[in-house]
Amino acid sequence: MRKTFLTLLCVSSAIAHAADEDITFHGTLLSPPTCSISGGKTIEVEFRDLIIDDINGNYGRKEVPYELTCDSTTRHPDWEMTLTWTGTQTSFNDAAIETDVPGFGIELQHDGQRFKLNTPLAINATDFTQKPKLEAVPVKASDAVLSDTNFSAYATLRVDYQ
């Protein structure tokens, strides 16, 4: 009986000395900044004259001149930034958009790699000097019969920051 009383006394003693402590939580909420490509202006890529027989997926390559800007210098390494390009895909190349000439398209590449349409490309959100080099490359279907004519194509390049 004495053991039971001593055990109860120890438990009661521990409960009698309990204390409450307050906890304070604080921090800063940040939203990703609004970003734009080339200040919202249309990016022009001029191919000039292309020799039809030389179009091979490498010939006529042109750099796509673009700039990324954000309305804040706040960058968080956990935020993800992506580039995506959209347009009407050719039937013969999933990284090329149709032009107004059947069987002829424009492929976009990033750093020498095919940039598939509607596929986000992760980019460095904290250092825009490391943005991917984009190049447009004329491509044609293997069975295309092209003739002398002007051509044009339209696509959208989008930056997302989350």
UniProtKB/Swiss-Prot annotation:
The annotated phenotype of a deletion mutant is: Deletion of the operon under classical laboratory conditions does not result in any major effect on E.coli capacity to form biofilms compared with the wild-type strain.
Kindly indicate where the leader peptide sits in this chain. Answer: 1-18
Bilayer-spanning residue ranges: none
Q: Which keywords does this Swiss-Prot/TrEMBL entry list?
A: Signal
SUPFAM superfamilies (UniProt xref) = Bacterial adhesins (SSF49401)
A single Gene Ontology biological process assigned to it is: cell adhesion involved in single-species biofilm formation
Query: What would be one Pfam family of this protein?
Result: Fimbrial
InterPro entries on file: Adhesion_dom_fimbrial, Adhesion_dom_fimbrial_sf, Adhesion_dom_sf, Bact_Fimbrial_Adh_Pro
**Gene Ontology CC terms:** pilus
Regulation: induction: Expression is negatively regulated by H-NS and subjected to cAMP receptor protein (CRP)-mediated catabolite repression.
Q: What top-level branch of life does the organism fall under?
A: Bacteria
Q: What does this protein do?
A: Part of the yfcOPQRSUV fimbrial operon. Could contribute to adhesion to various surfaces in specific environmental niches. Increases adhesion to eukaryotic T24 bladder epithelial cells in the absence of fim genes.
The entry's family comment says: Belongs to the fimbrial protein family.
A further note on this protein reads: The operon is cryptic under classical laboratory conditions, but is functional when constitutively expressed.
Q: Under what name is this protein listed?
A: Uncharacterized fimbrial-like protein YfcQ
